[in-house]
Amino acid sequence: MAYETSSDHQLAAAAEFLAALQVHLAGAEASSPTWGGRCAYDEDFMMYEFKVRRCPRSRAHEWTSCPYAHPGEAARRRDPSHVTYTGEPCPDFRVAARAACPRGSGCPFAHGTFETWLHPSRYRTRPCRSGMLCARPVCFFAHNDKELRIVGDDAAAATPSPRSPFTTSEDSPPPSPMDMKQIVLAMQQMDARKATRSVAPKTDMLQQELEEDAPELGWVSDLLM
């Protein structure tokens, strides 16, 4: 009776990953997205500077279209590279109810939607449900395989993840078999959504977009309050 070793499992996971990647990329080349009005800042800016760095403009302007932080703005964020907190929502912080957290800026949890979903442990770690059709000016989710980030369970709050799960650097270890399974699942979900939308009637697509977007638009209040 033959026994499988850890190397066999890694090779099998790698083979599955490469097969899924080939299928995914085969359909992605012809549908390269043009993002229109969506902000084009890179992920490092979004995680560490968006609504973190103080706005340098002294003249009055529209806060909701400005990527920088302003005095009294609910969307302001603590810098995750200098303040240690996780991407888990704080149970005592409620923007709508104006409930202040008793721990203040030293709280180990995220305050508000922007701190939660722009945290390095969360940002673009899940596929966007709208996929290529996403029209949000600010979206916390990945719209293709290059945007998808894989973050380990033990990722530190101040440690950024690799820019892409398909590229590695000297400082970044290769994806583990478990990471590969997550990548494969995410790519399969993206491909399934694209295939469904390509044959669905436009009215059904619009209704589905409205239903899917509804629970995700709560962060708009963070910009307006």
Swiss-Prot record:
It comes from Oryza sativa subsp. japonica (Rice). Residues 155-210 are annotated as: Disordered. The lineage of its organism: Eukaryota, Viridiplantae, Streptophyta, Embryophyta, Tracheophyta. InterPro entries: Unkempt-like (IPR045234), Znf_CCCH (IPR000571). PROSITE patterns: ZF_C3H1 (PS50103). It holds the Pfam family zf-CCCH_AtC3H23. Keywords: DNA-binding, Metal-binding, Repeat, Zinc, Zinc-finger. PANTHER family: UNKEMPT FAMILY MEMBER, ZINC FINGER CCCH DOMAIN-CONTAINING PROTEIN 10. It comes from the Eukaryota. Transmembrane segments: none annotated. One of its GO terms (molecular function) is zinc ion binding. This is Zinc finger CCCH domain-containing protein 10. A zinc finger (C3H1-type) spans 84-114, 123-145.
